[in-house]
């Protein structure tokens, strides 16, 4: 009986305490009908920012260990979640930061990164899951910040191959080495680009020639020549791998600037994956300046060392894109590469040749892509040279060619073909190959002229 009498009194006390607890927590203010961001506070938040309850202003997020879940509590910050009324990190494993320190979890690293941003402007990023290895250097040191060449090599090396050309002696059955060089993989199925002189020989000895390709991982394959252009010194060969291969992508050599860093990689003296670095001396060195009388190509000149065996290997920019094929060394510090835009043209021409009755066309000009450095050079020689930012500079018109007969002159600037603006020479070359007639818009001095040119078919 006595217990029953005490029960109503106990319930009354509990109800009173609940009311007092609710009274201590101020009621949430109603959200305004219109959000006025000018009235939002500008707090400094070590835990980051989150939208407020009305989704109007940014307020400080609750940090790890702070209460959450109640009507007036701020949402938990980035990578945190509300667990039993307290903000906890979603991940519990330790991580290694780029500052060389081990953090208890991802959230602790992110908090340190926000503090570092406020102090030095350099964030701390996650390097790996788990503790930092012993003896790890500060990853913000110059060795780690400026080792960009190592990053490029790590990216491109698996797609660079060593190529050897042998002659199978008909009597003794021995392989007689004829040449060796490098190449790079262009397709996962085994298409490789190299120099024509690496995979062909002028040897008059009798016997069957064989091509052997060795990958970075040591796998070796017999290769066959798919397409070859000895004048341009470009060739493609094919292997049949057992699995997909790493590949390199072609960059845009017309965008190269003098002074730009480049990396050359190849197999000089059969020493695979030998790396040299340098800068672009000029992106358009006329082949005739190198004593190549029949050349219609502008080469990339670099001081990256290219030796015997480097031929056919890639010259890449710091993005790991192929911007040339290592081809020729004149002297120490003076080497040359075939531009990637010419490789693209070669691949396109031979693809067309395989899919249709293909005929080569030409209009008879030697040309250079307009670049700021070229305009500066031409203005120095001729102050009246027009101020142009893009187009094709006609360096020379071949006598009795379609261009000469159509009225094109040395020094003209071709700005459009069939109404399309020209950004580089490859676009004009593509139009010559694929279109039966060309309407060229030309800038000559201060005059804009139109010329109709019919490309000539070369059998």
Swiss-Prot record:
Q: Which residues form the PDZ domain?
A: 365-450
Q: Which InterPro entries match?
A: Growth_fac_rcpt_cys_sf (IPR009030), IGFBP-like (IPR000867), Kazal_dom (IPR002350), Kazal_dom_sf (IPR036058), PDZ (IPR001478), PDZ_sf (IPR036034), Peptidase_S1_PA (IPR009003), Peptidase_S1C (IPR001940)
Q: Which GO terms of type biological process are on file?
A: negative regulation of BMP signaling pathway; negative regulation of transforming growth factor beta receptor signaling pathway; proteolysis
SMART domains xref list: IB, KAZAL, PDZ
Q: Where is the Kazal-like domain?
A: 76-134
Free-text function comment from the UniProt entry:
Serine protease that cleaves beta-casein/CSN2 as well as several extracellular matrix (ECM) proteoglycans such as decorin/DCN, biglycan/BGN and fibronectin/FN1. Inhibits signaling mediated by TGF-beta family proteins possibly indirectly by degradation of these ECM proteoglycans. May act as a tumor suppressor. Negatively regulates, in vitro, trophoblast invasion during placental development and may be involved in the development of the placenta in vivo. May also have a role in ovarian development, granulosa cell differentiation and luteinization.
Species for this entry: Mus musculus
IGFBP N-terminal domain boundaries: 27-90
According to its UniProt record, where is this protein mainly located?
secreted
Tell me which GO cellular component terms the UniProt record holds. extracellular region
Please give the residue ranges the record annotates as the region Serine protease.
181-347
- Record's subcellular location: Secreted
- Which Enzyme Commission number(s) are listed? 3.4.21.-
What Pfam family is a match, any one?
A: Trypsin_2
Task: For this UniProt record, give its keywords in alphabetical order, as a comma-separated list.
Answer: Disulfide bond, Hydrolase, Protease, Secreted, Serine protease, Signal
The entry describes its oligomerization and partners as: Homotrimer. Interacts with MYH9. Interacts with TGFB1; the interaction inhibits TGFB-mediated signaling. Interacts with BMP4; the interaction inhibits BMP4-mediated signaling. Interacts with TGFB2 and GDF5.
The yes or no answer to whether the keyword Phosphoprotein is present is no
Which cysteines share a disulfide bond?
31-54, 35-56, 40-57, 45-60, 68-82, 76-87, 89-107, 96-132
User: Can you tell me which family this protein belongs to?
Assistant: Belongs to the peptidase S1C family.
The positions making up the signal sequence are 1-23
> What is the protein name stated in its UniProt record?
Serine protease HTRA3
Q: What is the effect of changing residue 311 to A?
A: Abolishes protease activity. No inhibition of BMP4-mediated signaling
Instruction: State the conditions that upregulate or repress this gene.
Output: Up-regulated during early pregnancy coinciding with placentation. Also up-regulated in joint cartilage affected by arthritis.
Question: Which tissues express it?
Answer: Highest level of isoform 1 in maternal part of the placenta, moderate level in heart, testis and ovary, low level in muscle and lung. High expression found in granulosa cells of the ovary. Expressed in bone matrix, particularly in articular chondrocytes. Very low level of isoform 2 expressed in placenta. Expressed in the bone matrix, particularly in articular chondrocytes.
List the active site.
197, 233, 311
Q: Which domain of life is it from?
A: Eukaryota
């Amino acid at each position: 009986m006595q217990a029953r009498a005490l029960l109503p009194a106990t319930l009354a006390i509990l109800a009173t305490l609940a009311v007092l607890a609710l009274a201590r927590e101020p009621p949430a203010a109603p959200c305004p009908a219109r959000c006025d961001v000018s009235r939002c506070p500008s707090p400094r938040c070590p835990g980051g920012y989150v939208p407020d309850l009305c989704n109007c202003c940014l307020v400080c997020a609750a940090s790890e260990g702070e209460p959450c879940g109640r009507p007036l509590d701020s949402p938990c910050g980035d990578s945190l979640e509300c667990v039993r009324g307290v903000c906890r990190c979603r991940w519990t494993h330790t991580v290694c930061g780029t500052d060389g320190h081990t953090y208890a979890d991802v959230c602790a690293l992110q908090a340190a990164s926000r503090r570092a941003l406020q102090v030095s402007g350099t964030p701390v990023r996650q390097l790996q899951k788990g503790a930092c290895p012993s003896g790890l250097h500060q990853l913000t040191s110059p060795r780690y910040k400026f080792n960009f060449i190592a990053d490029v090599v790590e990216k491109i090396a698996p797609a660079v191959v060593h190529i050897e050309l042998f002659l199978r002696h008909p009597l003794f059955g021995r392989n007689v080495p004829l040449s060796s060089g490098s190449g790079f993989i262009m397709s996962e199925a085994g298409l490789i680009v190299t120099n024509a002189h690496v995979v062909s020989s002028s040897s008059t000895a009798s016997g069957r020639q064989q091509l052997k390709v060795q990958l970075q991982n040591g796998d070796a394959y017999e290769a066959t020549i798919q397409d070859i252009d000895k004048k341009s010194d470009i060739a493609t060969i094919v292997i049949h791998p057992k699995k997909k291969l790493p590949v390199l992508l072609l960059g845009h050599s017309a965008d190269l600037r003098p002074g730009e860093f480049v990396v050359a990689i190849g197999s000089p003296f059969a020493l695979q994956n030998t790396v040299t670095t340098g800068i672009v001396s000029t992106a358009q060195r006329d082949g005739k300046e190198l004593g190549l009388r029949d050349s219609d190509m502008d080469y990339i000149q670099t001081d990256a060392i290219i030796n015997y065996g480097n031929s056919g290997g890639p010259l890449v920019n710091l993005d790991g894109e192929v911007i040339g094929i290592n081809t020729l060394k004149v002297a120490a510090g003076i080497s040359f590469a075939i531009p990637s835009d010419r490789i693209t043209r070669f691949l396109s021409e031979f693809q067309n040749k395989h899919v249709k009755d293909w005929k080569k066309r030409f209009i008879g000009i030697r040309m250079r892509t307009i670049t700021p450095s070229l305009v500066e050079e031409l203005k120095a020689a001729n102050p009246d040279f027009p101020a142009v930012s893009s187009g094709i500079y006609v360096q020379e018109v071949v006598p009795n060619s379609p261009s000469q007969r159509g009225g094109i002159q040395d020094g003209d600037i071709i700005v459009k073909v069939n109404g399309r603006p020209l950004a580089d020479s490859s676009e004009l070359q593509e139009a010559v190959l694929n279109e039966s007639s060309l309407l060229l818009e030309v800038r000559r001095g201060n005059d804009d002229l139109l010329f109709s040119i019919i490309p000539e078919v070369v059998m």
